[in-house]
Regions:
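Aromatic "clamp/platform" in nucleotide-sugar-dependent glycosyltransferases that forms part
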Residues: 288
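Carbohydrate-associated surface elements
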Residues: 171, 192
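Short hydrophobic beta-strand element within catalytic cores of glycosyltransferases
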Residues: 305-308
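Short alpha-helical donor nucleotide-sugar binding micro-motif in glycosyltransferases
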Residues: 159, 269-270, 276-280
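Nucleotide-activated donor-binding/catalytic signature segment of Leloir-type glycosyltransferases, i.e.
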Residues: 252-270
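Conserved acidic donor-binding segment of nucleotide-sugar-dependent glycosyltransferases
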Residues: 319-320, 324-331, 340-345
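Acceptor-binding helix/loop patch of EC 2.4 sugar-transfer enzymes
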Residues: 61-70, 116-153
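Conserved donor-binding/catalytic core segment of Leloir-type glycosyltransferases
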Residues: 200-223, 229-234, 242
Length: 395
């Protein structure tokens, strides 16, 4: 009998952010052994076939800005999800819930005897709050993030209620253990990349005779953009530092002089990320707090060595192999790494080759296959140790 996995994503399925990650996992987990259905408020231009999709909202609400109906959309999606799970109380169906699923829904699933898996797209909120509070304090700013004590407590209760938790980063695992989540609940996992999304040979940027370093993602304090600006300026490397993403207002206000340098370029949202990466020599990502840093996997797939942090390394970047993994506040280490990438082309190329080779094991099809096996093993009563081996062999 084919097992069923019902996925609850309390957000529109748009192919961006967490919905992209969820969709790519669902698409490749679906198969003869495991039937996957994703419950969402609505979809927009993103197919995850052969996985199934259940849209909770009626068609006439599809074009209403989601911020105006998000409370209703989330409630309706969770209600439909619970109705479906109550119909499948034969042990062949599991629930896989994503962040922002309500505690009430998780408890209702447990009361119905349903096994619940939970995704972590970031570290435990308690850990994230500590990291971000300190980051803003260092910059002389008040905390400009949205994590409060109430949300930390709510997430802790959800984590206590679920059966298993997918951890896409070793730092995520550590953060959960620090907050008392039982080790046996933790399932080491990763995110991945899609080679089809990066095929081609076009370049987004014109050639440059110096080193091209790229940063992709929200240009914000959490992702260490201000640190990279400082390290780049102090490295005195000849070349260009290119940021691609939306910018946090305080970064523009407080580090405007560094952003205005002739060797710094800021781009808004980039649709051709492959073209951006093909224009670059190095991927730099001094992120302070992260779950599964998808951009790191994608950069590696495009053959870019990384200079990043333990948070930004994910399961793919190993220190002195696919790049450098450094403490985000290690200014001397970061400056030295940037200088080495500029001066030692042979070592940089060796790291680039290693990154491209290692990325082959993190294509979405392989990532999802490992996840599917973890779910099936749990449903069959396999030991937790067996759930760990496929991924640990890669890192």
């Amino acid at each position: 009998m084919t097992a069923s996995l019902n996925v609850l994503l309390p957000a529109p399925l748009t192919g961006r952010g967490p919905s992209y990650t969820c969709g790519m996992l669902a698409r490749s987990m679906h198969g003869p052994e495991l039937s996957v259905t994703v419950f969402v408020p609505r979809t927009r231009g993103f197919s995850i076939a052969p996985a199934q999709v259940h849209e909770a909202l009626p068609f006439w609400l599809k074009r209403v800005p989601y911020r105006l109906i998000n409370a209703y959309g989330d409630r309706k999606t969770e209600s439909d999800f619970l109705d479906e799970m109550r119909l499948r109380r034969n042990g062949s169906a599991c629930a896989y819930v994503w962040p922002d699923t309500s505690l009430a829904t998780v408890r209702a699933l447990r009361d119905a005897g349903v096994t619940v898996f939970r995704e972590m797209i970031n570290c435990h909120r308690g850990t994230a709050k500590i990291i971000l509070d300190e980051a803003y304090k260092r910059t002389g700013l008040p905390p400009l993030h949205s994590i409060d004590d109430r949300s930390v407590e709510n997430e802790q209760r959800v984590l206590q209620a679920v059966d298993q938790v997918f951890c896409p980063n070793a730092c995520v695992e550590s953060s959960l253990l620090e907050h008392g989540v039982e080790r046996h609940k933790l399932l080491p996992a990763s995110y991945g990349w899609d080679p089809a999304r990066f095929k081609g040979d076009s370049k987004l940027l014109p050639p440059d005779d110096g080193l091209t370093v790229v940063f992709a993602g929200t240009i914000c304090t959490r992702k260490g953009a201000h640190l990279l600006l400082d390290y780049w300026a102090r490295s005195k490397v000849r070349g260009r530092l290119v940021f691609a993403g939306a910018i946090e207002p305080c970064i523009r206000e407080k580090w405007g002089s560094l952003l205005a340098r002739d060797d710094v370029q800021v781009m808004d949202y980039v649709s051709d990320v492959g073209g951006l990466y093909r224009s670059a020599d190095v991927f730099a990502f001094p992120t302070l707090e992260e779950g599964g840093p998808q951009v790191t996997y994608e950069a590696a797939g495009c053959g870019l060595p990384a200079i990043t942090t333990p948070m930004g390394a994910g399961r793919i970047t190993r220190h002195d192999r696919e790049g450098f993994v450094l403490d985000p506040y290690d200014d001397k280490g970061w400056i030295s790494a940037l200088q080495m990438m500029a001066e030692d082309r042979s070592k940089r190329q060796a790291m680039a080759d290693a990154a491209r080779e290692h990325a082959d094991a993190f294509q979405w099809t392989d990532v999802a296959k490992r996840r599917r096996q973890q779910i099936l093993d749990h449903m069959s009563g396999a030991t937790p140790e067996r759930n760990r081996t496929p991924l640990e062999a890669l890192v």
